[in-house]
Amino acid sequence: MTTKKLTKLLALYLPYILLGLVATNLGEAWRLAEGKELGEHIMSMMGTFPVAFANPLPSLHPLDLLIGFSCGTGLRLAVYLRSKNAKKYRHGMEYGSARWGNAKDIEPFMAPKFSDNIILTKTERLMMSNRPPDPKNARNKNVLVVGGSGSGKTRFWLKPNLLQCHSSYVVTDPKGSIVVECGNALLKNGYKLKILNTINFSKSMHYNPFAYVHSEKDILKLVTTLMTNTKGEGSGGDPFWEKSERLLLTALIAYLHYEAPAEEQNFATLLEMLNTMQVLEDDEEYQNPVDLLFEELAKKKPNSFAGRQYKLYKLAAGKTAKSILISCGARLAPFDIQELRDLTMYDELQLDTLGDKKTALFLIMSDTDSTFNFLISMVYTQLFNLLCDKADDMYGGKLPVHVRCLIDECANIGQIPNLEKLVATIRSREISACLVLQARSQLKAIYKDNADTIIGNMDSQIFLGGSEPTTLKDLSEMLGKETIDAFNTSDTRGNSPSYGTTFQKMGHELLSRDELAVLDGGKCILQLRGVRPFLSDKYDLTQHPNYKLTSDYDPKNTFDIEKYLNRKEKINPNDEFVVIDADSLPPA
């Protein structure tokens, strides 16, 4: 038994032990008293009390010890029976104990240094460390931000957290305004910036998903992401066609990965292969150029992954195969645009390096046209997988630099496959996901039954204001009820007039749905797992220490994307280069 448990037991039973010891002296007084009748015996005890208590030590006579033991045990039994049968009262909490959190509630979760925190509200923050002084205060860094249009999701939450500059950042940037306004601040804090622009391809770095394919598993993930986010509106029907497309795309991408040179591993080559796959319905023996490629592959590598997948696709009859090709062509139609082909020709983003040193990746997308948003989803899917694998394989399970994904307009980027599993596992790898939505129903529309799992893995949830009924209903229920005092008055008039007042207690929502709908524009509600909710002011961006480095403060700080992308890389004197003399190379 530990010392702590022993001390606790001693404190519990000490009063009864002391009473038992005192009762031994009472037993001695009773034993020394004379008298045959009970009354005479009791009267005689008055004279034996001084004798019995003359010695401060307890009596050790067997009869006295029995009386002492009986008194101590009897009192303990009486207390136990009373507590067991006692009525349970919760004074002031009869109908609910909900209340707003205060400074004392949030204090254990905040780091002393301002820059080592996630900014949640004006007065509440969450430490970045996954190992607080008290382990019970550990929380994951996933955040769910919900707010209607114009509620300040970007200004009051996303920008202040981006300016903290304590992690690498992946920022979904609708309209491309965030990088323009905050890019300069990040550069001055030593960040390397990377930009994928799906609005203006000429102001973007190149991104080639094929560059991150290293195994058959990666091929399947790439195909799944592509298929999931290029379904189109109202897609459904017979799953046969989708499964057939998956077979063909998997076969072609696998062939490019294992057989084609690196410069040909891209969507442009994939489209060229599809365009040469002519099918003649009335000639089953006809072989197109791709058929010949796979026939040659089967001779060299009979059990290749690409060959096995293509063999399954070729089981389709001519007319069916033609329909599959048409479906694949329609799915990859965006890549017929030359600018997009050029964008995905090679890779400059180096997604797997974001956890090595401080880097900010901005994913610029249109908030009105979702045509190219599937590229953003592909980036996130590959990013999560790459960083998790690198953390496990190279860094013992944790990245050197925490990577925070600030996913603004999360509902517009498409579906990230297995997001419900990722948000539950990325915490230990020093990765966090922050989902910014206009309403919770947006998440449910995309992820269906998995939406609740995703929300459940967000330890911090912030409501900035809105009027969507489902969001208001869920939030009001989660805030709970408090117990309030109410009184009724009655005034009876007539021949015998009377007046009365009745006081009673009742339950009332901490904030009802109608009160949430008219929440002050400067207020927000924070819910941190295991802590009372907070009704606080939104964080004022102008008070941030790095605000003066943004273009909001001074237009001179505006970040020029085109100028940054066209700059020449500065050569560091310590950089090492390998010089190859072309004349010394053997002839091809």
Label each region the model flagged.
Residues 18-28, 134-431, 446, 514-538, ...:
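P-loop NTPase motor domains
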Residues 126-132, 231-240, 262, 485-504:
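Low-complexity, polar-biased intrinsically disordered regions enriched in Pro/Ser/Thr/Gly
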Residues 423-525:
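Conserved ATP-driven motor cores of ASCE-family P-loop NTPases powering translocation/secretion/packaging/pilus
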Residues 114-120, 374-382, 475:
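Conserved long hydrophobic alpha-helices within structured protein cores
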Residues 1-151, 155-158, 202, 481, ...:
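Basic- and hydrophobic-enriched, low-structure N-terminal and domain-boundary segments
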